[in-house]
UniProtKB/Swiss-Prot annotation:
CDD domains: UDP_invert_4-6DH_SDR_e. The keyword Protease does not apply. Homohexamer. It comes from Campylobacter jejuni subsp. jejuni serotype O:23/36 (strain 81-176). Transmembrane segments: none annotated. Signal peptide: none annotated. NADP(+) binds at residues 13-16, 37-42, 61-62, 81, 85, 123-124, 135, 139, 168-172. The lineage of its organism: Bacteria, Pseudomonadati, Campylobacterota, Epsilonproteobacteria, Campylobacterales. One of its GO terms (molecular function) is nucleotide binding. Substrate binds at K85, N167, V175, T193, R252, E255. Belongs to the polysaccharide synthase family. Its EC number is 4.2.1.115. Pfam families: Polysacc_synt_2 (PF02719). This is UDP-N-acetylglucosamine 4,6-dehydratase (inverting).
């Protein structure tokens, strides 16, 4: 699907973008991979690792629609990974978060239309479901924009979908690098917000492969959610440092005890497939008569029961401490 195609990744110098680029180069023969981001140092560092002839590096911000549109010329597929994502930072800088996560999302949509992009997938987060913080609220708004964009598309070829998942192992600013840094510094204890806290868990590699698959299975308008394990934060801390004690510091501003990826309010829109769920649009899409119980590959899903929810505390799949370490070690070696 990606052989001979032009692919643009917003926020492409981040953990996801670098892993996505690696997987594309190892498994496909794209014509161009365009890394669109605003940090020149990160682009310089990435270009020294990924220096294939097909690589292109564009300095630009998703807040700048004109620059986005220039970068998207002749692009076939877009992965929108750029976001302001750290919950406390967003709480203290709300308008900056809105400009990047909401206005930036609309700019991506507009640039896709202007350039006749075939498909665009936006990355979302479990925090967008029943949000209690600004980051989650902006990502919910972003999700709504990308789903509704399929109506704006009308008879045009551009289609938009969303991929939502939980905590990514080893991503910048996540809990694993934070804990490992404290351990390396000789800390005698690890800070835990609440012993009851649970989170969804996915490796960078699995996240990338899920997005790649969604390009093939999407009609446009779906929110894709992978079936992934949950973990307790205390189990993660013990797996990384079994001899260290835990210091309870309390939940930070905007945090939840448990994350939700599908709320019971969306159960009437949700289909279960073998390895993932798909939430169909809550609005009728004009000029698109898709049966969301069957994906574009012809695979059939089943409607979930009324009242179904998918949260990190009611998840039937849990990662053991050994599995957590295996995922961490595999991610670091990937």
């Amino acid at each position: 699907m990606f052989n001979g195609k032009n692919i643009l990744i917003t926020g492409g110098t981040g953990s996801f973008g670098k892993t996505y680029t690696k997987v594309l180069l190892e498994n496909y023969k794209p014509n161009k991979i365009i890394i669109y981001s605003r940090d020149e140092l990160k682009q310089f560092e990435m270009s020294s690792i990924f220096n294939s002839n097909c690589m292109r590096y564009f300095i630009g911000d998703v807040r700048d629609k004109e620059r986005l549109s220039v970068a998207m010329r002749d692009v076939d597929f877009v992965i929108h990974a750029a976001a302001m994502k750290h919950v406390p930072v967003a709480e203290y800088n709300p308008m900056e978060c809105i400009k990047t996560n909401i206005h930036g999302a609309q700019n991506v949509i507009d640039a896709c239309f202007e350039n006749g992009v075939k498909k665009c997938i936006a990355l979302s987060t479990d925090k967008a479901c029943n949000p209690v913080n600004l980051y989650g609220a902006t990502k919910l708004a972003s999700d709504k924009l990308f789903v509704a964009a399929n109506n704006i598309a009308g008879n045009k070829q551009t289609r938009f979908s969303v991929t939502r998942y939980g905590n990514v192992v080893g991503s910048r600013g996540s809990v694993v690098p934070f804990f490992k840094k404290l351990i390396a510094q000789g800390s005698k204890e690890l800070p835990i917000t609440d012993t009851r806290m649970t989170r969804f868990w996915i490796s960078l590699e699995d996240g990338v492969k899920f997005v790649l698959s969604n390009f093939e299975r999407m009609h446009g308008g779906e929110i894709f959610i992978p079936k992934i394990p949950s973990m307790k934060i205390t189990n993660l801390a013990h797996a990384l440092a079994p001899n260290l004690s835990h210091k309870i510091i309390g939940i930070r501003a905007g945090e939840k005890l448990h994350e939700i990826m599908i709320s019971s309010d969306d159960s009437h829109l949700t289909y279960e497939f073998e390895n993932y769920y798909a939430i169909s649009p809550s609005i009728k899409l004009v000029d698109q008569e898709s049966d969301f119980s069957i994906n574009a590959l012809g695979e059939k899903g089943q409607k979930v029961k009324d009242g179904f929810s998918y949260s990190s505390d009611n998840n039937p799949q849990w990662a053991s401490e050994k599995e957590l370490l295996d995922i961490i070690n595999h991610t670091e070696g990937f």
